[in-house]
A protein has these predicted regions:
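Flexible "cap/lid" subdomain of the alpha/beta-hydrolase fold that forms the substrate-access gate
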Residues: 2-6, 17, 29, 65-103, ...
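N-terminal carbohydrate-binding accessory modules
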Residues: 9
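Glycine-centered tight beta-turn/hairpin loop motif at sheet-sheet or coil-to-beta transitions
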Residues: 12-16
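Conserved HGGG/HGGXW glycine-rich cap/lid loop of the alpha/beta-hydrolase fold
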Residues: 18-73
C-alpha cells in the first residue's frame, strides 16, 4: 500500500483549499469530495487503492470544513451549488489539471455534479453517491412529504442563527444524532 496522504494547500480566487494527495504526480487525476458531516478521512480506505492503481488522488476539505479558508474577510460565505462547483474547478486550476475524474457523496456529490454540468470539458468522469445531484431550487419552495421533512430537520435548523450556535456549541452531539437517524 502507498503512504498516507501528504497535505498541501492550493490557492484559488476565493479559497485556500487544504487537500491531501497520494499516488504518482503524473497519475490520472481523481478528486474525492466528502459530504457533511464528514471530511477527507471518509476516504481513508479508498485512497491507497486508487493510488496503487496509478491515480493521482486529491482529497480536499470543502469550503466550511477543516483548515480550508476563505482568502478574504469580505468574501460572501455561500453554500450555493454554483459556488461549490466553482470551488472544484478552482482547485483543478490551482493544481494545473486540465480535467479529472470527480467522485463525491452528499455535498461532495453535489459539487461534482455541478462542476460536471457547468464545465463538462474539465470532467473526465463522474461518480456521485447519496448526493443531492443538481438541486431544483424552485422545487425547494414547496414542502416534501412529512417523513422526508422529518429526515431533513437539520437542514432547516442550519438555516438559522440558533442552528449555527447549536453546531458551534455541541458539534459532536449534533453529528451523533445525525448518524443515528
Amino acid at each position: 500500500m502507498t503512504s498516507p496522504l501528504n497535505m498541501w494547500t492550493a490557492r484559488t480566487d476565493v479559497l485556500e483549499t487544504t487537500y491531501g494527495q497520494a499516488g504518482p504526480q503524473n497519475g490520472w487525476p481523481i478528486i474525492l469530495l466528502h459530504g457533511f458531516p464528514y471530511d477527507i478521512h471518509a476516504y481513508t480506505e479508498v485512497v491507497p487503492i486508487l493510488a496503487d492503481a496509478g491515480a493521482r488522488v486529491v482529497v480536499p476539505y470543502l469550503r466550511g470544513f477543516g483548515p480550508t479558508r476563505f482568502r478574504f474577510a469580505d468574501t460572501p460565505r455561500s453554500g450555493q451549488q454554483a459556488a461549490l462547483g466553482r470551488d472544484v474547478i478552482g482547485l483543478l486550476d490551482a493544481l494545473q489539471l486540465d480535467s479529472a475524474v470527480l467522485a463525491g457523496f452528499d455535498w461532495g456529490g453535489l459539487s461534482a455534479c455541478v462542476a460536471a454540468a457547468l464545465w463538462p470539458d474539465r470532467v473526465a468522469g463522474l461518480v456521485s453517491l447519496a448526493g443531492y445531484d443538481i438541486i431544483d431550487v424552485d422545487r425547494l419552495r414547496h414542502p416534501f412529504a412529512p417523513s422526508l421533512e422529518q429526515a431533513l430537520w437539520y437542514q432547516h435548523l442550519f438555516q438559522t442563527e440558533r442552528g449555527r450556535e447549536c453546531l458551534a456549541n455541541d458539534r459532536r452531539e449534533l453529528c451523533r444524532l445525525l448518524w443515528q437517524q
